[in-house]
Amino acid sequence: MKLIHKLEPLWWILFGAGGFVIGFVLPALILGVLLLGPTSLMADGLVYHRAIRLASSPIGKLFLIVVPTLGFWHCAHHLRHFALDIGGHGAAALGAFGSYGLALLGTIAAVAAVLAL
């Protein structure tokens, strides 16, 4: 059995968790930060010192790592299956290594950026 098939449950877990994050958490984050933040509905909610304090806390750092990382893995799984649909089994390995490699690079970049806070 190929390694990619042995790791398939891991990819599906990351895909499902990423789908949840993209479907539920990201729209709420966009609503809160981009739409309600500039209005008076969240008075002093997004001032700099409160935002940096939240981002520097352990829960904030975990949130800033988990949300983009799971989104990367969700998109990587979609890209892998897209490559499989377009190129057949000949492009499956390249699509898998390419998409999951990009997701891994995105994960490393997200962790490095958050740890630099």
What are these regions (language model features)?
Residues M1-L117:
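Membrane-embedded alpha-helical bundles that constitute the cytochrome b-like, heme-associated redox core
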